[in-house]
Structures are given as structure tokens and as C-alpha cells.
Amino acid sequence: MLNADYLVRQGQLKLLEIKDSDIRILTLEQARDAVDKGIHIGGAFSAVVPFVSLFYGGVMNLDVVQPTRPGQDLFVLSKGHAVATLASIYADLGYFDRSVLKNSRSRQSILNGHPGPILPGIPISTGPLGQGLSVAQGFALIGKRNPAFDSFCLTGDGELQEGLIWEAVMYASYKRLDNLCVLVDKNSGQLDDTKQLVFPLLELVDRFKSFGWRVISVDATQYGPVLDALREFKFSPRDGRPTAIICRTRKGFGGFSSVMSGHKIEIPDSLTEQEIDMQRQRRELRAAEFLRFFEALESGGLGGAARDRLLAMAKAMNLNIESGRKKSPALQTIAVSAKTRKAPPRDKAIRYDPALLPKLDKAKEYSASGVITLAMRAFARDPRVVTIDADLASTSGLEAGVGYVDSSRAINVGIAEANMMNIGEAFAAMGYNAWVSTFCPFFDWKVLRRIAIGYQERIEAAQMKGGWLNEGHGLDLTFLATAPNFETKTNGGTHMGNDDSLVFDGIAHLKIIDSSCPQQVLSIMKWILEGNRGLVYLRILRAPSGVLYDPDFRFAFGQGYFLRRSDADRVVMISSGRGVFEALSAADLLAKSGIAAGVVDMPSIDEAMILDLYDSGKRIIVAEQNNGFIWSHFQRVLFRERKNIDSGRLVAINTLAGNGKPQFIHSATYSELLDQFGLAPGQMAEKVKKAVSR
């Protein structure tokens, strides 16, 4: 005997198939109307069944009106090639108007070739493969707190060739993130070969299981198995294991033409219209089959209960069932208007008691990490402060400080820097003031660049007319870079931070700061915790140093500071980090020779000061224990703002090779490194003497 649950399930699967047709039609129309008529069609179509099951199967708790409301489930599209399908679904759900689907990929559109938070409902930017799962894992970590929620992610199987995926897989299992569900679109194709992987990932189920995951392998050419797997994750008892649903399908599944199995293609209009027409015919057949099934259900008893539930399910899918004696049966798609409202502003300022901050004595030396530990004991009392280390917590001081207050917010991912950075982004996207830390050369450029792209899109989405985000919805994410310049000394070139500032200087929106003293570090931390500082790359000294600044010092980004100055100065030495101490010592030596020298600490680039110093007519010495970060900006500013430049008054001392090319540095003691590059106080003093004698 049939029961109501069975009848509802059969009807639900038929409704999902109808929705499948709607989404494929929207996606094809999107390709037809794109500025380049292009689409990653194979991966977009293979993902439709998992997508539709997830968003219309009743397994996600979403607030389309307020996508940033805490406590709702989150979704990350790691395989960015499926953005067209996701955009079709989000337009259908009401995250934005369907008009957004037209003219996609164009300069005027917010719908790009890969997803990003300029598009309503999208939390992060994805595209570089392997990173989305890592961020989704970060969301799952947050979802273990209150209010609790689940984190979903869709990856491709080719994407699993990325090492970062397995960093996240290992760590998610270790952290028992049973609120994390990953759907793998196993379409067995990728860019270079759409019919097979470049190298096969055999025994994928066993691979995930070996890392402690619960794995469900399903036929993703049908809705029943995928929906059952999602319901098992969502509603069955949990035991600490993350869930991976392996969705076995093929590239372009659900399309009619063989062209639909391609990677990124431009579809001729004639073929697109042919494909759309055939999809519409399929929809008509599916709708007719559902309506026959629905009409056969009795109006009372079990059939009546099933009808009522199916009517509610259809409404949730934006489908309208017309049925009754006075009407011909019909099943129409409801084109909803945009529902998403502008997010409420976020107050990002961290609350703390200043009396709890460390008091530094100018007569003593302190390590930056030690000061950070003591400061974080005060800052971390605000639950929005979180830190993530990668097996170098002893050099950052973060874990010891935050862990003293709340160990659950003092995270250490082990030797997995890329995973660390993505987890940090997840926390920052949810409104936390997040800090991640490792040695300067160990930050991942590809990850940092993607995060910065997402940051830019979040700012654009907050500032643009009709944007869905608001003030305070950027990212407050600090990259605490330890052991910069010569601080790693005998560890050798792989650990030496003499080039990181210049490499990362090309990352848009990244605020680079090279701190010189413990009091300055404390002031920089206070500045960051005021909130809305964006992406900050903060370099700190490893070994202890003296205190240069008074307790009331207030850091401002883009400002240099005179540590020594007089009207008699014939030369000004500019430096940052520990180089400032060497410049001060050089100034002492010069004073004994009767030469007055000013000293500037420039932790971040002060363009106005650069111009003022040049216009003063004094000799300028830019001395840096790296490949010339300040010097590169000095040249850039002068050539942009001044027509005639007297280069004879400018002297650069740094770690560039004699021909001006970048180079790496071999192991040596700190004093040996100073001598090697002419950065010892005596050497700098001699350079100054030669400069002023010309």
C-alpha cells in the first residue's frame, strides 16, 4: 500500500526534473546573451543535478532576503566554471533580477566569468582551483559556534588534483567538521581533455574515507540518489565526520547536442536556439507527467496530504500548479523579482580595555611576538577576534595570546599556509577581525591574490548603486609576516624575507607595513582593531628590539615618522624595520664627524613625505634590509610628480645585486649580512660622508 511519504517523494523528484529544465534553459539563454556568447557549458551542465537537488530539495536553510544574516547555511562554488548554472539558480531564487543574466561577462555586468561577491549571495571570489573547499571548511568552523549552521561546497573532480584540496580534507576531518558537506562533480573531464581526467583519481571514495570522511557515491544523472545523499547528510545523526558526496556524471550531461560536452565554448545562436527549444520540449513532457501524477492523487486521505505537501514544495521551487475541475492542468514557472535587500552595516570596531594592554619601558627590549601575545590577551576578549597559525605560532605570538582567552579562536592548521589563509578569509567574510601568520616567504601569492579580488568585489558591492553589501562588509584580515628582511639570518634564502614586500606590492588593496619597534607594533594592532582596515600585510621583527616610540604614539597608514631631525641636517636616512636602528646608529657616528643627519622610519609608504624630502634639497639615503621596497616607491613617486629629478642627491642601499637585479640571500649571521650589503652603521656613515662631499 502506498503511503503519503512515498507519493510525496515521487512527486518531488518530478518537480526537481522540471526545475532542472528551467535552470538549463536559463543557463543557455545566459550564454546566448553573454557579451562573448561564451560559457563553460560542460561543467555548468554536469553540475545542474547536484545544484538543483541542493537548492530546491529542501536541505538548505537560506535567507534570500538577507544573505548575510548569521545562522543560515552557506554555499561555496569551488569549481568556478559552473558559475552560469549558479547564477541561473540565484536569479530564479530572487538574489537578483533575471536581467543580470543578460550581457554577462561584459564590462557593465556584475556577472563575471567566475563567481565573486559583487554578485548578491556570493560570499567569496573563486576561480583559482582548489581554494573554495578550503574556505567552505573555514565557514564550517564558524558554523560549529553559535548560531550553528551547515557549510556546503561544490568542487570538480579535476580540481581534486590541487594539493590545497587535501590540506582542507585532512584538517576538516581532524576538526570533526560534520557540518561540512562537499559535493564532487565527478564528470571525468577537464580543460585539456573533456572526456577523461589528465590523470585519473582512482578509488576516490577510499581516498576521502582514508582521511576520516563519510563518503556517499551516487549516480548524479538522477535526482533520487543525489537528494537521498543530501538528506542523509542533513537529517541523519552526525558522528564528527565531514561528508563527501561523489556525484558520478559526465561533462555536458542533460544537454542534447554533443557540443554541450565541451569546456569553454562559444555557441552559435542557431545551435543555442535549437538546444533551448529541445529543453523546452523536454520540460513540457516532464510537466505533463507530473500533472498526470498530481491529478491522480485523491483529494482526501493520503492523496490529499500528498497534494498539499507537493503544492508547498512547488511554491518553494517557484513553480505554480494549476489544477482543478474548472482549470486545465498547468505548471508554470514563477519569475520572482529580486528579494535580496542591502545588508545592514557591520560595526567592525573591536572592544577592549586599554588598561589591560602591555606597558613598555623604553629602557628595555621586547620581542614583537611577546608584545602581540600580551596585547591579544586584551583584544581577544572581544569574541570577533580570531587567529590562525601554520606551525609558526611561536614566532607570531598570536596563538598564545588569543588562546589565553579562548583556545577555540586560536587556530593552528599545521604546515598548510594556503589552507590557513583561506580559513582566515572565511572568518573575515563573516565579520571577524582575523589574523593569519607565517614566515614572510611562506604566504601563497595565488591565494592572496584571489582573496584581494574578493575583497575588491565586496567593497564594490557595498559602494555601488543597488549593491547588496554595506559598510563593514569588507574583509578585516591581517597577514602577520614574521622574520622579515634579515631576521631569519642563518636559515638561508628559502626563509629570508628580502623580496616579499616587492612581490606582494603588486596585489591590489594590500596595505604593506614594515614595523620597527614593539611600541609601534602595539599601535598598529590598535589601528587594525578599529575595524575596516581591509587587507594588511604586517611585517614584524623576530628578535627583541628596543622601544623607539612613546606610549601615546598613534600609527597612521601612509605616514612616515622623523626619529631624528634638526635644521642643520644635511642628509636624511630613510629605513624601516630593524634598519631604523642601524640608521640611528649611523646618525650617531655622523654626528661625531660633524655631519647632522635626520632619520625617518617609514613603516608604510608616505608619498607626501617622499616629495617633501626630495624638495628639501638634502641628500637622501634609502637604506633597506630587502630588495628596495621603499626605494621602488621613491622612484615611482618622483617620476610621477616631478619633471626634473636630481638623481645625484639620492642613494639607495639594499640587497639588490650590483646590476640592480633582485637576488636571494645565503645563510649568514645578522652582522655578516649587514656587512655584506653595506648596511652596517659604519658603512652607511661612510656612504653619507661620500655623498655630502660631492
For every predicted segment, state its role.
Residues 158-165, 222-227, 515-522:
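Active-site glycine- and acidic-residue-rich loops that bind
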Residues 81, 158, 186-188, 391, ...:
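Residue-level signal for short, function-critical loop segments
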Residues 1-152, 166-533, 544, 662, ...:
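Thiamine diphosphate
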Residues 160, 196-197, 367, 415, ...:
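Residues that cap or flank secondary-structure elements
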Residues 79, 155, 184-186, 219, ...:
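Glycine-rich, histidine-containing beta strand-loop boundary motifs that form or position
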Residues 164, 199-200, 419, 496-499, ...:
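Residue-level preference for nonpolar/small residues embedded in alpha-helices
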Residues 79, 158, 222, 416, ...:
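Short beta->alpha junction loops/turns
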